[in-house]
Amino acid sequence: MKSELFKNELKTITSDDIRDFAKVVLDDAPDYFFKVAASSTGKYHPAYALGDGGLMRHTKAVLRIYNYIIGLEQYQNQFDERWIDLGRVACLAHDIQKSGTAEIYEEKAKDGKKVFTVFNHPLLAAEYIRNYKGLYLEDDELEIIADAVSSHMGQWNTSDRESIVLPKPKSQLEKIVHLADYLASRKDIDISFKDDTDAYDLPDIETYKCPYKKHKDELLTDVAKTDPEYLEWLHENVNMREPMKTFVNELLKNKTN
């Protein structure tokens, strides 16, 4: 079950029926949601959200930050736990259609096209939630989740390439979900996943390309052969993110064996 990849995050949802619904939402998600990077261009998200599984890690980070925010003393006794749980589902679902519906993604990928972020993905994700009306939760609760999902882009709600204007957050819940997503998207805020074994599936080392300037876009295995001193320098001087950290360590270990 796909939702098993979010077992730690699902544990933070206290209402049994809302947690069960969150599992359904994740299990029904497009396969790409668990595989692609959070940013199709690499411009708008931190290193941990790039590469294979980046969107999944970004989603985990959004919920983690949401839980930090909602746990502050200033919010104590302001909201009931059920309301907070609906926000947790919104965090998990906010980018669940980031590259469009499963059909749209598969059609583009089949033709070998690069699949970019779809601007109206908040609206698609909100509709994804509304499609469960009458099944798991009360309709008004589904609407609370859908509204938080549709407005998660906040002030970045227009595009030069689209005529669509996305809604901005209005309720306190919508504003907190947006804030969590905003903070999880900052390049200078790092999130550690070292204790979350499900958060990172390493890509194939044989096809992984170096992200750093000197050997940018060269196969890392080739760099290990042509410039092994560079890998040693990285190991000693650079605070590398995954998967680069694991790969460099592995290549250096193989060199000494």
Q: Regions from the language model: what does each represent?
A:
Residues 1-108:
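Acidic/His-rich, divalent-metal-binding segments that scaffold phosphate/diphosphate chemistry
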Residues 14-15, 149, 217:
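Extracellular/surface recognition and adhesion modules
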Residues 58, 94, 121-122, 152-153:
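Histidine-centered active-site/metal-ligand motif
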Residues 63, 67, 86, 122-126, ...:
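An amphipathic alpha-helix signature
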Residues 78, 87-88, 135-196:
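Histidine/acidic-rich helix-loop-helix segments that form or flank divalent-metal centers
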Residues 100-105, 111, 160-161, 188-189:
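A short secondary-structure junction signal
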Residues 108-128:
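Divalent-cation-assisted or electrostatically stabilized phosphate/pyrophosphate-binding catalytic cores
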Residues 198-257:
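Accessory DNA-engaging acidic/polar modules
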